[in-house]
Design a protein with these regions (language model features):
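Extended acidic/polar, glycine-enriched regions
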Residues: 67-110, 114-117
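Short, conserved catalytic or adaptor-binding loops enriched in Gly and charged residues
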Residues: 103-108, 170, 192-194, 290-294
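Short Gly/Pro-enriched turn/cap motifs at secondary-structure boundaries
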Residues: 11-13, 115-119, 290-292
């Protein structure tokens, strides 16, 4: 039996995201049963396996997992074989993987890779940027605040790749794009459920700014946004199902033109269309609330379902990029 237990928390109960990853030395031709004990938490992430050290992943069949009536214990049947297996709640996307992806994007599209700070563990915090210093507008997108949220990272990558491949030169001439692919490298490197190494959920620290990663990112984004019209602010995450958290549409303190354009794109291009939830955690220290209060932009949290299929992930990322491009083109000169 393995006990799946969260990292230390200094701010109350941790979000129930019982993430796990481990290596299993089977060395048997027969299947092996393993129990995952979540103690006071519940089974959430279906296991995937890799036989090639994470280069490729296969989701176990539905009959390979049995969850107890109370959800606290899951019995997993692992296939036999001569070699060891990696087992994880989602296919792993490590900081090294994300660094390789970032480097490729920078090289392909002539972006700049900017180190804007250092995490609590001393890891570099990086942004990918493109667009002239004289640009009057800016688009900001980020991901990687919560370690297990792989589908959100995947959608962000589609968004970034589509944006860079398709943004017109005339739009790029007056728009700066700032992309943050990994806000919480410590949590991801340590395999945490939710927090950084300081025991805090970084997406509740944007107003207090008690953690080095959030101090650095808020300072950097404020500098990038100074004197510019912040057109869009997107933060990609994962949760139980695909949805979008947004400021209240009916309140006039933020321009909701881009959120409405994105909603229209999702409604027309995805079936069923994602739910939009206005005013969620309106007082919490989330990135979207910081963006609203500090940058005067309606920050959006785009949540992908934990088990969103590749086609849905691709659609969310691509449609988000197209919505940004179309909105920038339509509002140029305003």
């Amino acid at each position: 039996m393995l006990t799946v237990w969260p990292e230390a928390s200094i701010a109350g109960p941790i979000n129930p995201s019982p993430w796990y990853a481990f290596e299993a030395d089977i060395h048997s031709s027969d299947p092996v049963k393993l129990r995952l004990d979540y103690a006071g938490y519940w089974h959430r992430y279906f296991p995937w396996i890799s036989r090639d050290n994470g280069a490729s992943w296969q989701k176990l069949g539905e009959d390979a997992v049995t969850v107890g009536d109370d959800g606290h214990i899951a019995t997993v049947t692992l296939p036999g074989g001569p070699d060891s297996l990696l087992v994880a709640g989602r296919p792993l996307i490590t900081p090294a993987d994300m660094s390789v992806w970032s480097r490729a994007l920078v090289e392909r599209y002539g972006m700049q890779r900017v180190t804007y700070g250092e995490s609590l563990d001393g890891r570099p915090l990086e942004a990918l940027t493109i667009g002239p210093d004289t640009a009057s507008r800016i688009v900001i997108a980020l991901t990687g605040q919560h370690p297990p949220e792989q589908s959100g990272v995947a959608a962000f990558e589609v968004f970034a790749e589509t944006l860079m491949a398709e943004v017109p030169a005339e739009t790029l001439a007056d728009t700066r794009f700032v992309l943050l692919p990994l806000v919480n490298p410590d949590g991801r490197a340590r395999g945490n459920w939710r927090h950084n190494n300081g025991g805090l959920d970084l997406n509740r620290d944007w107003l207090n700014q008690s953690q080095p990663a959030i101090k650095a990112v808020t300072r950097y984004l404020s500098q990038e946004a100074e004197g510019r019209d912040v057109v869009a602010f997107l933060d990609f995450h994962s949760t139980q199902k695909t949805l979008v958290y947004t400021p209240p549409f009916e309140e006039a303190y933020a321009d909701m033109s881009f959120p409405q354009a994105l909603k229209n794109a999702f409604d027309a291009g995805i079936e069923p269309a994602p739910e939009w939830i206005a005013g969620h955690n309106a007082e919490a220290g989330t990135s979207k609330n910081w963006a609203l209060q500090t940058l005067d932009v309606a920050g959006l949290t785009v949540e992908l379902g934990d088990d969103a299929p590749p086609a849905e992930i691709e659609s969310i990322g691509r449609l988000s990029a197209h919505a940004v491009i179309n909105f920038l083109s339509r509002t140029a000169g305003e």
